[in-house]
Curated annotation (Swiss-Prot):
Highest taxon of the lineage: Bacteria
Protein name as catalogued: Putative S-adenosyl-L-methionine-dependent methyltransferase MAP_3881
Family of the protein in this entry: Belongs to the UPF0677 family.
Residues the record lists as binding S-adenosyl-L-methionine: D121, D150, L151
Keywords in alphabetical order: Methyltransferase, S-adenosyl-L-methionine, Transferase
Pfam family, one: LCM
Annotated EC: 2.1.1.-
SUPFAM superfamilies documented for this protein: S-adenosyl-L-methionine-dependent methyltransferases
Gene3D superfamilies registered for this protein in UniProt: Vaccinia Virus protein VP39
Function: Exhibits S-adenosyl-L-methionine-dependent methyltransferase activity.
One Gene Ontology molecular-function label: methyltransferase activity
């Protein structure tokens, strides 16, 4: 039985994107494919091994809702990798990855001496990932601290209990989180808590979506249907909350941050990629926007 109930759909798709990008030479995540295999979704495992998502000539070339999202996830992963390296060069030694899922940055990236990476997610997600990585004899590249808690609960207190110091600058990562996964009030509370725990000089990298519109909802349905045609029953709609969301860069600008907005074209360009053939259709409607920000 597949373990998506344990690790979540977004974590699974993120691992799939990293596995594809690793085979293409765009990333170096040797753990993405084994983790995906451990989740146990046969279609994804076979598709990656067969290079199904690797080119416009592939069987999903007529479905940009699939390929465009995988490209976007891979591009943002690479962008965040570089964001964290830059934060390390600037002297930041405290990193928090919110809803870390199957991310393996504490194992696969270069880190300056003395860096601690805090990974926050539900305990069962962290336990699943740790078990698979132990079986792979994966070696940590820096100090890692797993914080098993739901982000709707008091995660700042949980961070403090394991040594997080809000007086020191932090590099924050929020991937596939500010995209409707939380209800509007929950997202606002998370951003308030993050801001309160951020000393001057802290940095944030996130993807985000403004309030979902009818075109995006239709694109989401097309995305889910694309997976179902290939035997993968993912109810992405169950992870999406409707409501009026603050535009994240504007929210940050009014709460003590200096934000810089970025587009998917910026991120794909950093990988030497352009849009997939057909990506201008409705399938790209729910590709997120991107922001980095510095606490002042």
């Amino acid at each position: 039985m597949a373990a998506t109930a344990e690790v979540g759909v977004t974590a699974t798709l993120g691992a799939a994107a990293r596995a594809v990008a690793t085979r293409q030479g765009l990333l170096n995540d040797p753990y993405a494919e084994p983790l995906l295999g451990a989740v146990g979704i046969d279609y994804l495992t076979r598709a990656i091994a067969d290079h199904t998502f690797a080119a416009d000539e592939s069987p999903v070339g007529d479905d940009p809702a699939v390929t465009s999202l995988l490209d976007a996830l891979a591009a943002h992963t690479r962008f965040v990798d570089e964001f964290l390296a830059e934060a390390g060069r600037a002297g930041i030694r405290q990193v928090v990855i919110l809803a870390s899922g199957l991310d393996t940055r504490p194992y696969r990236l270069w880190w300056p001496r003395g860096t601690t990476v805090y990974e926050i997610d539900r305990p069962r997600v962290l336990d699943f990932k740790a078990g698979v990585l132990r079986g792979l004899d994966a070696r940590l590249a820096t100090n890692r601290c797993a914080v098993g808690i739901d982000l709707r609960d008091d995660w700042p207190a949980a961070l403090r209990r394991v040594g997080f110091d809000a007086a020191q600058p932090t590099a924050w990562v929020a991937e596939q989180l500010l995209v409707g996964y939380l209800k509007p009030a929950e997202q606002n509370r998370l951003l308030r808590r993050l801001t309160a725990a951020s000393a001057a000089g802290s940095r944030l990298a996130a993807d985000h979506l403004p309030t979902w519109d009818p075109l995006q909802l239709e694109a989401e349905r097309a995305f889910v249907e694309g997976w179902r045609r290939r035997g993968l029953d993912i109810d992405l709609a169950s992870l999406t909350h409707l409501g009026e969301y603050h535009y994240v860069p504007e929210y940050l600008a009014t709460h003590g941050w200096e934000p810089a907005a970025r587009s998917i074209a910026d991120l794909l360009g950093g990988l030497g990629l352009g849009p997939r053939r057909g990506a201008g259709s409705g399938g790209a409607q729910f590709i997120p926007e991107y922001v980095t920000a510095t606490r002042v």
